[in-house]
């Protein structure tokens, strides 16, 4: 027997209602803010992610699914959604239709990580990209969209953490101070931090091992230039005026190299070690880095699997998927075709119908309808058809009535609405 690959999941049954709930909410919220959906390939040229995410990041060094295709090209399953979206923006000359461009995506991503609750090797993200605006209004909008989305899911136990990691000028001075701070601690830090000290010093602040050194490290907000400081203050002021709750975290840097300026993360209080449910920020230099014109941009992404865990942890009721509303059972050769016609009439009126396609007696059909959690059962029998009626049965209470053929749709709809 074949089994699914480690770190992947089969999504079906009762779980599907959570996926529909989150994806439908994401589409509705992005609609309210004028975002259009984009769907990019799940695999791209490896160099796209090396250039964008950063050669020294954990994603590129340890986590990417990379292979050679039959043309000896290096291909990678996408580990995140921003780089493919920006590649599509450049390749398809989307700038020609005007800026800013608002895009969103929902889809699977792939990273070779140690599977655990809320962390899979194939996982799914919802994300937005706001391309073409350098205004603090854009930074605030991204955070507001994220906040409205989470509130629309019914979540309350989450915290938005924000910071500014400044521009290249700010970071140059800050990196010097950070190197000075860690210079006498190199023999004490973890192996990853030893490597990052010379390749990407900011990533030391993201270390989950040497947290005692991180908390006492210099704060980048003390080294922001006037422009970056002004942008950060303007963004916070807008969020304050809109009553968006957030916490400042001067050690927040994010794990991808393309970020600059405003960055943010969202953590949920009931998810333990894997508390991050989303994050984002500015990437003003990414489009130029990937071959386009210098274009200020920003965005965020959220993990759908972790959002589902959060929704369940908070006990948020999620509407059942409205399928299997009616099971149509039939008895006798001459009743089959009429039962099919009745099923199609119900479907024409938006009622979900499961039609019996097996050679079963009535008791077996009713048992199957019960297993499917059908709310109602229509029984179409030869004897009833001779009298121009069918039987409508409530599967929960056992109540049943006879309905004249012409009133099947109306009465069935009434019974569904009453439940």
UniProtKB/Swiss-Prot annotation:
Enzymatic reactions: tRNA(His) + L-histidine + ATP = L-histidyl-tRNA(His) + AMP + diphosphate + H(+)
Q: Which UniProt keywords apply?
A: Aminoacyl-tRNA synthetase, ATP-binding, Cytoplasm, Ligase, Nucleotide-binding, Protein biosynthesis
Record Pfam families: HGTP_anticodon, tRNA-synt_His
**CDD domains, alphabetized:** HisRS-like_core, HisRS_anticodon
User: Which PROSITE patterns does the protein's record reference?
Assistant: AA_TRNA_LIGASE_II (PS50862)
* One Gene Ontology CC term in the entry: cytoplasm
Localisation: Cytoplasm
Q: Which domain of life is it from?
A: Bacteria
Question: Which sequence ranges are marked TM in the entry?
Answer: none
Q: Name one GO molecular function term.
A: histidine-tRNA ligase activity
Mainly resides where?
cytoplasm
In terms of InterPro entries, this protein maps to: aa-tRNA-synth_II, aa-tRNA-synth_II/BPL/LPL, Anticodon-bd, Anticodon-bd_dom_sf, His-tRNA-ligase, HisRS-like_core, HisRS/HisZ, HisRS_anticodon
* One Gene Ontology term from the biological process aspect of the record: histidyl-tRNA aminoacylation
Q: What is its EC number?
A: 6.1.1.21
Q: Which HAMAP family has this protein been placed in?
A: His_tRNA_synth
NCBIfam families (alphabetical): hisS (TIGR00442)
Family of the protein in this entry: Belongs to the class-II aminoacyl-tRNA synthetase family.
Q: What quaternary arrangement does the UniProt entry report?
A: Homodimer.
Protein name (Swiss-Prot/TrEMBL): Histidine--tRNA ligase
Q: Which gene encodes it?
A: hisS
């Amino acid at each position: 027997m074949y089994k699914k690959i480690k770190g992947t999941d089969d999504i079906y049954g009762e779980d599907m209602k959570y996926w529909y709930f989150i994806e439908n909410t994401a589409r509705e919220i992005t609609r309210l803010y004028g975002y259009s959906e984009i769907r990019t390939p799940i695999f791209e040229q490896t160099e796209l992610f090396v250039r964008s995410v950063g050669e020294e990041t954990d994603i590129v060094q340890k986590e990417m699914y990379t292979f050679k295709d039959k043309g000896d090209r290096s291909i990678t399953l996408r580990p995140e959604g921003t780089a493919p979206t920006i590649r599509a923006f450049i390749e398809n000359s989307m700038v020609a239709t005007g800026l800013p461009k608002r895009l969103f995506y929902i889809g699977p991503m792939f990273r070779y990580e140690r599977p655990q609750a809320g962390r899979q090797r194939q996982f799914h993200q919802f994300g937005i990209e706001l391309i073409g605006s350098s205004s603090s209004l854009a930074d605030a909008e991204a955070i507001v969209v994220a906040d409205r989305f989470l509130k629309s899911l019914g979540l309350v136990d989450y915290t938005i953490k924000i910071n500014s990691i400044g521009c290249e000028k700010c970071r140059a001075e800050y990196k010097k101070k950070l190197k000075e701070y860690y210079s006498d601690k190199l023999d004490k830090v973890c192996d990853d931090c030893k490597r990052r000290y010379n390749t990407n010093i900011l990533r030391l602040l993201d270390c989950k091992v040497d947290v005692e050194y991180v908390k006492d490290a210099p704060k980048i907000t003390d080294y922001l230039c006037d422009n970056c400081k002004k942008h950060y203050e303007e963004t916070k002021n807008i969020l304050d005026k809109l009553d968006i709750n957030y916490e400042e975290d001067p050690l927040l840097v994010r794990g991808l190299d393309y970020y600059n300026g405003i960055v943010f993360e969202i953590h949920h209080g009931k998810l333990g070690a894997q508390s991050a449910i989303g994050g984002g920020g500015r990437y003003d230099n990414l489009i130029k880095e990937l071959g386009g014109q210098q274009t200020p941009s920003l965005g965020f992404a959220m993990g759908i699997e972790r959002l589902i865990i959060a929704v369940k942890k908070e006990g948020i009721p999620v509407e059942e998927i409205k399928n299997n509303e009616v099971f149509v059972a039939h008895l006798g050769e001459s009743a089959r075709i009429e039962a099919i016609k009745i099923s199609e009439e119900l479907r024409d009126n938006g009622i979900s119908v499961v039609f019996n396609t097996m050679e079963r007696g009535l008791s077996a059909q009713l048992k199957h309808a019960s297993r499917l959690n059908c709310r109602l059962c229509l029984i179409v029998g030869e004897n009833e058809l001779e009298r121009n009626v069918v039987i409508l049965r409530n599967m929960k209470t056992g109540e049943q009535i006879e309905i004249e053929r012409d009133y099947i749709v109306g009465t069935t709809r009434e019974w569904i609405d009453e439940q």
